[in-house]
Curated annotation (Swiss-Prot):
InterPro entries: Ribosomal_uL16 (IPR047873), Ribosomal_uL16_bact-type (IPR000114), Ribosomal_uL16_CS (IPR020798), Ribosomal_uL16_dom (IPR016180), Ribosomal_uL16_sf (IPR036920)
Keyword Transferase recorded: no
Primary gene name: rpl16
Protein name (Swiss-Prot/TrEMBL): Large ribosomal subunit protein uL16c
Organism expressing this protein natively: Huperzia lucidula (Shining clubmoss)
Pfam family for this entry, one: Ribosomal_L16
Cell compartment(s), UniProt: Plastid, Chloroplast
Superkingdom, taxonomy of origin: Eukaryota
Length: 142
């Protein structure tokens, strides 16, 4: 599962999920992509589940690019703990995803297989998604 090797600080504020994605919203590497339509936190487990679904369906063919990385630590307090006594310890990592963000890209496989693989991965995501195809101009710029 994905997680940072080291961070400057162990804990982070939760933050807000406002606005749309201004970066990472265009196809850069592959021909087909899975794009988020809602804001959410996507955990490293969910990212890995989606990656496995795509690679298993594609069966060695083509290449997959994961365009998100879980760099936000989420802390959890122990069960039945009284109020106070500080913030909990980091439990898992999430990626903050805004609408328009590309989650996965796939290239080197036929469109039917790519669409089916992306659909399986989309079921594993906590957000509504859409499958987009790179235009010929975008393919030239790669």
């Amino acid at each position: 599962m994905l997680s940072p090797k080291r961070t400057k600080f162990r804990k982070q504020h939760r933050g807000r999920l406002g606005g749309v994605s201004t970066r990472g919203n265009r196809i850069c590497f592959g021909r087909f992509a899975l794009q988020a339509l809602e804001p959410a936190w996507i955990t490293s487990r969910q990212i890995e589940a989606g990656r496995r679904a795509i690679t298993r369906y594609a069966r060695r063919g083509g290449k997959i690019w994961i365009r998100i990385f879980p760099d936000k630590p989420i802390t959890v307090r122990p069960a039945e703990t009284r109020m106070g006594s500080g913030k909990g310890s980091p439990e898992y990592w999430v990626s903050v995803v805004k609408p328009g963000r590309i989650l996965y890209e796939v290239g080197g496989i036929p469109e039917t297989i790519a669409r089916a693989a992306m659909k399986i991965a989309a079921y594993k995501m906590p957000v509504r998604t859409q499958i987009i195809v790179a235009t010929p101009i975008e393919m030239q710029n790669q």
